[in-house]
Amino acid sequence: MAGREGVPILRNVRRLPDPTSRLLVASDAAHRLGGAVPSPAAAFLITLIVLPSLFWLVALKRTTGFTVPEEWLMTNLVPQVHSWVQTMAPPLDALLIGISGLGSGWFVAAGFGVLGLLALAKGRRDLALVLAAGTLAFPMEWALKFFTAIPPITPLQLLNALFDVREVGLDDLADFPAGHALRASVFYGLAAFCVARLAPDRRQGLTAYGVAVLLIGAISMTRIYLEAHYPIDVLGGWMAGAALVSVIVAVHVLGLAERIRAADALAAASDQRPRRVAVPLRHRRES
């Protein structure tokens, strides 16, 4: 019995897998591309598709407000579903409210800060810059709400709404775009991109993108469930967030590709230089 004191009791039990064990956090990983990282051309193509669509959606919102199917949905169906869930399944209602909070301004701002500091701690300044650029989602939301508000609002009203002066927030002044949908698209989209940059396995990156899409969709649907936004507002948040993410990703990947191309050209030039053969000094004297 004394000889068995140092033997672990659960020696045959496998350890839980570490989801971050296969991520590349070394400094040289910042200069490599691979996995599920999109190309700059694909990112810019998404931008070229989304931005004009967002423009026409803004024009539709300013001229019509909402469509007839949306009005029927938000008048006849959503309120009944919301009331039924509140009455028959209060835990589900609390869960949906909690999911909605994952796209709130304070949560997303804190998330950007935590992930940015984590990237710096791992020596990945490139990803920290990507996350810092993601905070542009906030002024982007404010600008879109300012220019699409009906009736128009003043800059002072917008400033007061940012701090909930007199309990009047941004959503009380302008519905378009849905701020939760926009912020969630940018935050979780860029977080998934960072995982794809760190993961050598393409499947890990695709899994991260899939989880991000599910989170964005769940957060956005809760805003409709809570009767805070019409579907057109949520669609506008998705488009605005996708446009910002695609621009940030394209700039990041294009800059990295240029650095890799320059390093390869420098290495090729150094290999093509004529090499001088070193001759020992005593051999020169004998000759």
Q: What residue ranges belong to the model's regions?
A:
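Hydrophobic alpha-helical transmembrane segments of integral membrane proteins
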Residues: 123-158, 214-231
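Transmembrane alpha-helix boundary/anchor motif
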Residues: 5-8, 53, 135, 139-143, ...
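N-terminal transmembrane-helix/juxtamembrane module of multi-pass inner/ER membrane proteins
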Residues: 2-110, 147-148, 152-168, 286
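Hydrophobic, membrane-inserted alpha-helices
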Residues: 93-94, 109-117, 192-193, 215-220
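Membrane-embedded catalytic cores of phosphoryl/pyrophosphoryl-handling enzymes
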Residues: 3, 158-285
